[in-house]
């Protein structure tokens, strides 16, 4: 029997739980939380006991024994900017997450729940590559306004995980020896330049930068945006929603569904075809930008995330970027496996857990 690892990923209305034997999935579950029940809590942090209890019930339901665990891993929440890696859960981290010092999000409960369970059974608790991973070069942080530096917020967990797998399975070398461009294509789209294990440049997928995506507007013409603000004077919440949530495909087509778009394209919907091509075009341009960040020394380009299941989109992108480097398509995202793989590297002595 290998190392026994429990992974926990809290979302807005559910908590995903999975049990691994080394990197082999034993079982997984998604505990749904009633929206009305959750709305009665004054904060996300106040949901801790409810969600922790539900995680333990899921373990019991699947017949696993918490006392056999070698590690518990929670999804990393909103912390200060940190370098990539596996972090031991400590009191400083717990306090900042519970207090929502850097923002409130359901993922803030990942580390506290992992720590609570790990403390009961005497094993370590970790987080792996949270969205706040920041390894950008200083030169890539600058914008044309000193008051508005660029920030690193991206799909770090999935980008790092698929980059490691491609390095292992196709190059037979450690991830830290390669220069890769990883394009995570989901509800949000982030494209990162991975230079010998560090993401030295990446678009801020949550901050209005990059290609348009199913739900996000991406980079916009700035003077036109200023005109819109002066003319319409939207409130902050409404405006933020137009950028993240109701932008991109939602604004153009009224849908955020890749399957819906794919169906409309197959049925010959010319506007849907145009939006798919425009999305692919913008993604391709950002991939090319990241080749510049790597000075043209690119070993491979990885296309991952849920939209990588759309062949028309992937083919469009490949036609435009194959001149840069070979393209590897790794559809979907497996955050639970990525969490387990991080813990496994520490348990096997391949990596040392960092202190927050």
Swiss-Prot record:
Gene3D superfamilies with a match to the protein in the record: 3.30.420.40
GO molecular-function terms, A-Z: acetate kinase activity; ATP binding; butyrate kinase activity
Catalysed reactions listed for this entry: butanoate + ATP = butanoyl phosphate + ADP
Enzyme Commission number, as recorded: 2.7.2.7
Taxonomic lineage: Bacteria, Pseudomonadati, Coprothermobacterota, Coprothermobacteria, Coprothermobacterales
NCBIfam families: butyr_kinase, PRK03011.1-5
Descriptive protein name: Probable butyrate kinase
GO biological process: acetate metabolic process
